[in-house]
Amino acid sequence: MVTIALGSKNPVKISATKEALEILRLNWDLIATDIDSGVDKQPFCDQTYVGARNRALNAIKATNADIGLGIEGGVCNVYGKFIANAVVYVITKEGVENFAISSSFTLPSSIVSLILQGKELGEASDIIFKTINSKTKEGAVGLLTNNIIDRKTLYVQPIILALYPIYNTIINNTLF
């Protein structure tokens, strides 16, 4: 049985990973482990990739799993607008590495202002929307889209994309 270690105990990340594995019909054992990303509490731009990779790599080390998976949400200033997205990073014991990025969405200035004051996106969203711990539920994306797209939905697609070098037997071991 293949084991995959998720570098987080966030219930949204666990649920999204389970859903992606179900869609892929992969009967893998999922281990969720609390891993520090090694980057700032609110990563910006490239830090998001570093944090996701650190989570994946350290999840393997902590659990001796076959695959490590890290999910890190971040923000970045693009053409004067702040966008939010997530990076999903996958590493196997054999050293195969791949990543994928979620859809991006712009953040309103009220949330950006709080982020620039040192708040994390989830914390800033909770302040603006008067919610509690939204990062373990619908997330900023759910609050902004009236839950048409929630945080779990945002993560499922990049998890599937990041894992393709492992589950796609046609390209497995040929491109990576």
From Swiss-Prot:
Complexes and interactors: Homodimer.
MF GO annotations: ITPase activity; metal ion binding; nucleotide binding; ribonucleoside triphosphate phosphatase activity
InterPro entries assigned: ITPase-like_fam (IPR029001), Non_canon_purine_NTPase (IPR002786), NTPase/PRRC1 (IPR026533), YjjX_NTPase (IPR050299)
Reaction catalysis annotation: XTP + H2O = XDP + phosphate + H(+); ITP + H2O = IDP + phosphate + H(+)
Binding-site residues for Mg(2+), renumbered to this chain: 36
Protein task: Phosphatase that hydrolyzes non-canonical purine nucleotides such as XTP and ITP to their respective diphosphate derivatives. Probably excludes non-canonical purines from DNA/RNA precursor pool, thus preventing their incorporation into DNA/RNA and avoiding chromosomal lesions.
Enzyme type, top EC level: hydrolase
Protein family per UniProt: Belongs to the YjjX NTPase family.
Name of the featured protein: Probable inosine/xanthosine triphosphatase
GO BP term, pick one: nucleotide metabolic process
Enzyme Commission code: 3.6.1.73
Cofactor note as given: Binds 1 divalent metal cation per subunit; can use either Mg(2+) or Mn(2+).
